[in-house]
Amino acid sequence: MRLTAVFESWHIGDGNYPPLKVGQAVNLSFQVEPVGKLDKTDQAVMFDVADDAECVFASELIPIYRRPTERPLGIFQAGEFRFYVEDESIANFAVGDRVGSAGTLLFDYYIWVEFLHEYAEPPNLFYTFQVKRIRKVTLPTEFVTRHVRAVGHPTRLRGDQYAACDIQDLESMEGQNFGPEFYLIDLDTEGVSKTNVRKTFLGS
């Protein structure tokens, strides 16, 4: 299984994840943040993610959780891949519904991995991958607002909001500024041991 997911820079400052490097074995869970409406669908089950981490899916809703999250959280399954969506509209669906939408695939920001012990009978959302490629995306200046004591910017951009000149391939995230930038992480399950890889989230 191959995926590309967004790693937002604030994870480093908050101590959620360590800087990653190419070749590293990681154990991760994932979130999809929808960019459109979630709808019931009769489409065949699928999950496709592009190299900018933008994805489309038609996936089966497994459980729905209303605690400990502030918004309803639904676990979705498409073939061998499971992920969560945290969205108010999850309350409109029932377990077993097939739901389709588009969105961005991201590293779990902590709501699943950190509070795993609080979910009733949680399904396994963790996957062991090898990091195959790391791309740093520096936010174009029009998305960055600089003040005397602070810098404001979004945590990530869609693929159509930046250009090839904003992307830099890295062997390691060590030593980066983790400022107005985010990272596209290419992951692959092939050739990586599925045993003895601890969860990459530092608080787990």
Locate predicted features:
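Short, structured beta-strand/loop micro-motifs enriched in basic residues and often containing a Trp
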Residues: 1-12, 78-84
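Structural detector for short beta-strands of small beta-barrel domains
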Residues: 44-71, 97-105, 120-175
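Long, compositionally biased, intrinsically disordered segments
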Residues: 1-3, 7, 18-27, 36-65, ...
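Short nucleic-acid-contacting surface segments enriched for D/E, G, S/T with interspersed K/R
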Residues: 13-28, 88-103
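Long terminal accessory segments
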Residues: 172-204
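Short aromatic-glycine-enriched beta-strand elements
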Residues: 68-76, 180-185
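Eukaryotic intrinsically disordered, low-complexity regulatory regions
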Residues: 65, 74-100, 176
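Short, Lys/Arg- and Gly-enriched loop/turn segments at beta-strand edges
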Residues: 32-45, 107-117
